[in-house]
Amino acid sequence: MIFDKDNYEEYDREVWEAIHAEEKRQQNNIELIASENVVSKAVMKAQGSILTNKYAEGYPGRRYYGGTDYVDVVESLAIERAKKLFGAKYANVQPHSGSQANAAAYMALIKPGDTVMGLDLAAGGHLTHGSPVSFSGQTYNFIAYNVDPETEVLNYEQILKQAEEVQPKLIVAGASAYSHIIDFKKFRDIADQVGAKLMVDMAHIAGLVAAGLHPNPLPYAHITTTTTHKTLRGPRGGLVLTNDEDLAKKINSAIFPGLQGGPLEHIVAAKAITFKENLDPAFKVYAQKIIENCQAMVEVFNAHEKFRVVSGASENHLFLVDVTQVVENGKVAQNILDDVHITLNKNSIPFEKLSPFKTSGIRIGTAAVTARGFGPEECRKVAELIVKTLENTENEAVLEEVRQEVKLLTDAFPLYENLV
């Protein structure tokens, strides 16, 4: 019978070969995409567990199906651990993604057509913070706030002035490409002054918040959302947190039955394991190393005149580099670096002049290489390899040298062994 096939290497060679090739790619490439990380084998194993068979619409103790005793145990563990990790009174661990977590938060806080302020996409915001191609920009009246054109960091006085002018119902704080500490208290003060609610999307910095290395938004935000991958180093999924009982009820209703049906309990199990890992003191050490590695790379780029680090610094796990003085655009840089086995993404920079398909910049994050074991010395080396590559795009001999140096690094810090 088909379901007796447990060796997919033999049963479905095409899928096996693609997955095996991806395993090799991850082992042999230096991963600098800021939204990616490396999960533990325990987290990976939970995602392939028997829980994938179980349907469980509803919430622990209030399911629409029978046979949910054990998934209730798993989901309750995930909820309690998430609450402990972030100091929240209420947590919903069911969102399939950060985008769905954000959609649920919007449904709980505002109505279609309401005015919302979110960070401009080119300044480091996210598609779900009001982009016209996203449900957020199509459902709500989003008005973008920006960074200061001189410093390229948030100017809270300017944000307050803009909020007083547009009178939003909601202000969204958080980013996908902003390299500095976000002052959530100031955002809450601004929201209170104009009678708005505050939502924080901490998807990128949640691991740093959990480790106490970035201010926690929970005391200030009406609702906080996050993904569970990125700096939390967990499975791909979402999480919604609040300290408000009424909002917690609205969030639960928004997620089920509003946006989703049955939760992915095998992913919820992986989230529970992730939160236990995050609560371990070793995780704080890891998170501190992420920041140290990021700052080590920034130092290298700041020492090279043709590479401009946006805002000149980083206080978290990522930073942007304007590469237009060395190559045509960010897409060109991304493709050339991919060819030498360094993986990152093109990215818009504040007040971007190029299209999102080309961009002036690249985004670099250190969560994945830190999980792999890289320290400041290795990260400085990687930064130098990026400079070397982009300054010698037509020199195949130099590019081959970079490939060999990348191999020395990836061989010295193996990722996984014999997973497939």
From Swiss-Prot:
GO terms for cellular component: cytosol. Its EC number is 2.1.2.1. Keywords: Amino-acid biosynthesis, Cytoplasm, One-carbon metabolism, Pyridoxal phosphate, Transferase. The keyword Transferase applies. Pfam families: SHMT. Its main location: cytoplasm. One of its GO terms (biological process) is tetrahydrofolate interconversion. Pathway: One-carbon metabolism; tetrahydrofolate interconversion; Amino-acid biosynthesis; glycine biosynthesis; glycine from L-serine: step 1/1. (6S)-5,6,7,8-tetrahydrofolate binds at L121, G125, H126, L127, S355, P356, F357. It catalyses: (6R)-5,10-methylene-5,6,7,8-tetrahydrofolate + glycine + H2O = (6S)-5,6,7,8-tetrahydrofolate + L-serine. HAMAP family: SHMT. This is Serine hydroxymethyltransferase.
